[in-house]
Regions:
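Fe(II)/2-oxoglutarate oxygenase catalytic core
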Residues: 2-260, 264-306
Length: 306
């Protein structure tokens, strides 16, 4: 039987994040509870649930109550013997198939540390993600925080001229763009095909509230119709603006935390931690509803991907 207690939300910062009390995510949720969570996501963008010792099945059940699950492609970067989770999860741990930390020079680890760059999950997909739900099973002794930036608050702090400038702009997103920033450039032909750039609007509007946000990510490598140097400088300026400390919440993980965030109005990044220590965190992702921009498979896009 669904528990009817309404969750309580306690703001963490003036702009972003709330801690949630009065809800046990191991139990099926009533429609009123789901509606309260959706409303809170629109308002706070990041929700923190402490002391939620979920099984994988319970994690999946909670996710499905909020929307359809996006299939993860991360296992394609792992060796078969290192796959720990089904594709309903994104395994964003630093662990191999024996639950041991990857070696410092392991290719999967070097690709994964690109997550230390500010990004929005799945902005490199034609239909980008809506919510992400990350759960901690083990945490390192120090470091490993996840930081979140509120892109709606950042948009509202822009001057009118900048808002007008970016309103019509379309960016191209690819994981190859973000990995290039850290010097990771060795991709197979199959990976280059899979990571072809997709187009996303630079300004998004939340459908239920009408609130606008900067839709930005380290995956964004250029702006359609702009010269590359000018495009990247504008994207850098916007990222520096959006990640000022006033717009950012840094989450220090505890075992059995579940943190969910709205990718449509946030960026996030992981922080460093000792390479020899385990950080077992696993994520489910809720699919978005539609593309933000038309996809044009033209010669220019193909050239950017090469």
């Amino acid at each position: 039987m669904a528990i009817q207690i309404r969750p309580q939300f306690h703001p963490i910062t003036p702009f972003i994040g709330a801690e949630v009390d009065g809800i046990d995510l191991r139990e099926p949720l009533a429609p009123e509870q789901i509606a309260a969570i959706d409303d809170a996501m629109d308002r706070y963008a990041v929700l923190v649930f402490h002391d939620q010792p979920l099984t994988n099945d319970q994690h999946l059940a909670f996710t499905r109550s909020l929307g359809p699950i996006e299939t993860s492609t991360g296992n394609k970067l792992r060796k078969p013997e290192d796959i720990r989770l089904p594709t309903t999860f994104a395994d964003v741990s630093n662990l191999d198939g024996n639950n041991k930390p990857y070696a410092r020079n392991d290719r999967k680890r070097l690709f994964a540390i690109g997550n230390r760059l500010w990004h929005s999950d799945s902005s490199f997909k034609a239909i980008p993600a809506k919510y992400s739900l990350l759960r901690a099973l083990s945490v390192p002794s120090k470091g490993g925080n996840t930081e979140f930036a509120h892109m709606g608050a950042a948009y509202e702090a822009l001057d009118d001229a900048t808002k007008a400038l970016i309103e019509p702009l379309i960016c191209e997103h690819s994981q190859m763009f973000s990995r290039d920033l850290i010097g990771f450039r060795e991709f197979s032909p199959e990976e280059r095909e899979r990571f072809k750039p997709v187009r996303q609007r630079l300004v998004r509007t939340l459908p239920r509230t009408g609130r606008k946000s900067i839709y930005l990510s380290s995956h964004a490598g250029t702006i359609v119709g702009w010269e590359m140097p000018e495009a990247r400088l504008l994207l850098r300026d916007l990222s520096e603006h959006a990640t000022q400390r006033e717009f950012v919440y840094s989450h220090k993980w505890r075992v059995d935390d579940l943190v969910m965030w709205d990718n449509r109005q946030t960026m996030h990044r992981g922080r460093p931690f000792p390479v020899e220590e385990a950080r077992d965190v696993r994520r489910t992702t809720i699919s978005g509803d539609a593309p933000t921009a038309a996809q044009v498979d033209d010669a220019r896009t193909q050239a950017v991907a090469a």
